[in-house]
UniProtKB/Swiss-Prot annotation:
This is Adenylate kinase. GO terms for molecular function: adenylate kinase activity; ATP binding. Residues 122-159 are annotated as: LID. One of its GO terms (cellular component) is cytoplasm. Signal peptide: none annotated. It comes from Shewanella woodyi (strain ATCC 51908 / MS32). Keywords: ATP-binding, Cytoplasm, Kinase, Nucleotide biosynthesis, Nucleotide-binding, Transferase. Its main location: cytoplasm. Pfam families: ADK, ADK_lid. CDD domains: ADK. AMP binds at T31, R36, Q57, L58, V59, G85, F86, P87, R88, Q92, R156, R167. Residues 30-59 are annotated as: NMP. Consists of three domains, a large central CORE domain and two small peripheral domains, NMPbind and LID, which undergo movements during catalysis. The LID domain closes over the site of phosphoryl transfer upon ATP binding. Assembling and dissambling the active center during each catalytic cycle provides an effective means to prevent ATP hydrolysis.
Length: 214
């Protein structure tokens, strides 16, 4: 099952991504992780990306698409994969379709901006693993501690309100158009599209996702 997650920063994508990966046994594909792995492995695309990054430039969509294509061909993606945070723009989505990277199901988690601002200030992260908690909505078993390791949780600087609002502006400008884009792709029967109310509890959203994906 090839799944793509859409939603604003703070909509709860990280928590649902973790759930989907465990439930369906598929890897999450993050472009940042992919870039680092390709550079470390010294693949031709990795060396090309390193050259660009060392020069302080942005890695082109073409190069990223090449890396995604390489990544989804690996053995652990045989049962599918989860794309979160990519594509971010319509040109990237077009390039991905042109490269023959098909998506079976687009999952959108929808949350109003003001709710996101409120949520972010209560977010806590385990720096080692990236596991995300919330002091109200998704509490750790022990306050301030990671469930798995027992290590301290931290507040990320980009959970500050001004930063959150800036990120939401960028999301609405660049990524929100993908909602309409993939809605049209689904209308043409090339993928399935499901939208979920992300203001519900984490468990409710997870349950609805399972029903939609089954």
């Amino acid at each position: 099952m090839r799944i793509m997650l859409l939603g604003a920063p703070g909509a709860g994508k990280g928590t649902q991504a973790q759930f989907i990966m465990e439930k369906y046994g598929i890897p999450q594909i993050s472009t940042g992780d992919m870039l680092r792995a390709a550079v470390k492995a010294g693949t031709p695309l990795g060396l090309e990306a390193k050259k660009v990054m060392d020069a302080g430039q942005l890695v082109s969509d073409e190069l990223i698409i090449g890396l995604v294509k390489e990544r989804v061909a690996q053995a652990d993606c045989e049962k599918g994969f989860l794309l979160d945070g990519f594509p971010r723009t319509i040109p990237q989505a077009d390039a991905m379709a042109d490269a023959g990277i098909a998506i079976d199901h687009v999952v959108e988690i929808d949350v109003p901006d003001e709710e996101i601002v409120k949520r972010m200030s209560g977010r806590r992260v385990h720096p080692g693993s990236g596991r995300v908690y919330h002091i109200v909505f998704n509490q750790p078993k022990v306050e301030g501690k990671d469930d798995v390791t027992g290590e301290d949780l931290a507040i990320r600087p980009d959970d500050e309100e001004s930063t959150v609002r800036k990120r939401l502006d960028i999301y609405h400008e660049q990524t929100k158009p993908l909602v309409e884009y993939y809605g049209n792709v689904a209308a043409n029967g090339q993928t399935k599209y499901s939208k979920f109310d992300g203001t519900q509890s984490v468990a409710s959203v997870s349950e609805e996702i399972v029903v939609a994906l089954s």
